[in-house]
């Protein structure tokens, strides 16, 4: 039997850092960067010790947006858990929904029972979400460097994607559309035409962002050689996503550990070899193009599966009524409500029971990982055989990746902290949860 070890980690706060600097007698300055600063990507606090304009020490302070999501899920049904998960990383919310539902389906043993159309719809919505998340990352990153045109184009194109999300799910954000067993609703009648037009628009306007970034001498000067983190650093700290692929390692869970039939889609893993901020931005630009390739294949598969089920047939999991919010802000049709609530007493009783009490999940635990917009997004669920999780945990890539910020910034200039942080693109809702 191995020996028990006790590991202690000592942090520090403002008073401690000031006292340490005073004892050393260094002519250094300790400054607070955030948490109320527009370049911290949310309520993040960086405690920076400066020797002139050089960063000699940097510590990351998080927890300002902690809302107890994981604990709250222990008091909600498995279906209601989606509503909490979608509010973690609110920029790339569909990935949270997907990884949670895949984990629940693995516990239920129904992974292979999810209809093909539901799997395609999941790929479609998450790849659109990947594009919109990268548009925010590149746009805000450019804005922080003074390139406001990049932000204008990014927000403009993201707005088109949000409008499509609203047409499909009824909401622009916090959708809770992906459910255990499939998706809540199918595409609207004009959904395929809207997706087709959206793909054409992305093909036309996404290269516009690349024109502002790829060969812009100011953008390159502010990002090349900045925030250096090589492969050994990323592996030691568990960094994934664009930051890891910027070291030249083609690690993408859609290829290495396929889910949702990603092994049947034709796309390439974007890599770079500079290990710096510029490489991470270039990878995001390339990944948006690859997502468009995947969306084209989704469009073809959605045309072939039109009219098929989008939820498992098991009545213990699927709701008898597809109660959902439409893009007009209204609910389902009167005919649909009449069928569930006025014609079948058994359907009404079953619907009431499965919505209020929920379904039971066999006892056990599971870990499911997918390739989110920022890296490996994992969900660890523990079930005691009841109608709600015994324990839930989310491995948010932003939480792990932001721990590499001191390694990137210490020894560099203060002005390089902002592009280094922007290249990681942490979303504090996911970091703090």
Swiss-Prot record:
Belongs to the complex I 49 kDa subunit family. PANTHER family: NADH DEHYDROGENASE [UBIQUINONE] IRON-SULFUR PROTEIN 2, MITOCHONDRIAL (PTHR11993:SF10), NADH-UBIQUINONE OXIDOREDUCTASE 49 KDA SUBUNIT (PTHR11993). It is found in: Cell membrane. This is NADH-quinone oxidoreductase subunit D. It comes from Cutibacterium acnes (strain DSM 16379 / KPA171202). NDH-1 is composed of 14 different subunits. Subunits NuoB, C, D, E, F, and G constitute the peripheral sector of the complex. Its main location: membrane. Its EC number is 7.1.1.-.
């Amino acid at each position: 039997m191995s020996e028990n070890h006790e590991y202690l980690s000592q942090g520090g706060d403002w008073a401690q850092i000031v006292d340490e600097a005073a004892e050393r007698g260094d002519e250094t300055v300790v400054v607070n960067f955030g948490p109320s600063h527009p370049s911290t990507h949310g309520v993040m606090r960086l405690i920076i010790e400066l020797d002139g304009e050089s960063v000699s020490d940097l510590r990351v302070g998080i927890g300002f947006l902690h809302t107890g999501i994981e604990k709250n899920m222990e008091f909600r049904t498995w279906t209601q858990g989606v509503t909490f998960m979608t509010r973690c990383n609110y920029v790339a919310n569909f990935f949270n929904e997907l990884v949670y539902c895949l984990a629940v389906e693995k516990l239920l043993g129904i992974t292979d029972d999810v209809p093909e159309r539901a799997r395609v719809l999941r790929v479609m919505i998450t790849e659109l979400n990947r594009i919109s998340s990268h548009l925010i990352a590149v746009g805000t990153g450019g804005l922080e460097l003074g390139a406001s045109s990049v932000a204008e184009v990014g927000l403009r194109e993201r707005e088109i994607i949000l409008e499509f999300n609203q047409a499909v799910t009824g909401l622009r954000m916090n959708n809770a559309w992906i459910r255990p067993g499939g998706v809540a609703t199918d595409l609207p009648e004009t959904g395929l035409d809207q997706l087709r037009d959206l793909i054409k628009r992305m093909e036309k306007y996404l290269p516009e962002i690349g024109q502002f970034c790829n060969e812009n001498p100011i953008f390159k000067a502010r990002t090349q050689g900045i925030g250096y983190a090589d492969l050994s650093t990323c592996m030691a700290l568990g960094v994934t996503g664009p930051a890891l692929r910027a070291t030249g390692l083609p690690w993408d869970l859609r290829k290495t550990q396929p889910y949702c039939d990603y092994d049947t889609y034709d796309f390439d893993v974007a890599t770079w070899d500079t290990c710096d901020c510029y490489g991470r931005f270039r990878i995001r630009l390339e990944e948006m193009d690859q997502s468009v390739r995947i969306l084209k294949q989704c469009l073809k598969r959605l045309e072939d599966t039109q009219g098929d089920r989008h939820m498992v047939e098991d009545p213990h999991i699927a709701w008898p009524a597809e109660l959902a919010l439409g893009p007009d802000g209204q609910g389902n049709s009167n005919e649909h409500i009449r069928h569930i609530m006025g014609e079948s007493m058994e359907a009404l009783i079953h619907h009431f029971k499965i919505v209020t009490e929920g379904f039971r999940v066999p006892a056990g635990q599971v870990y499911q990982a997918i390739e989110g917009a920022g890296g490996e997004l994992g969900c660890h669920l523990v079930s005691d055989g009841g109608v709600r999780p015994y324990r839930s945990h989310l491995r948010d890539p932003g939480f792990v990746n932001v721990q590499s910020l001191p390694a990137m910034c210490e020894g560099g200039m203060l002005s390089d902290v902002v592009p280094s942080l922007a290249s990681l693109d942490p979303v504090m809702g996911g970091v703090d949860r």
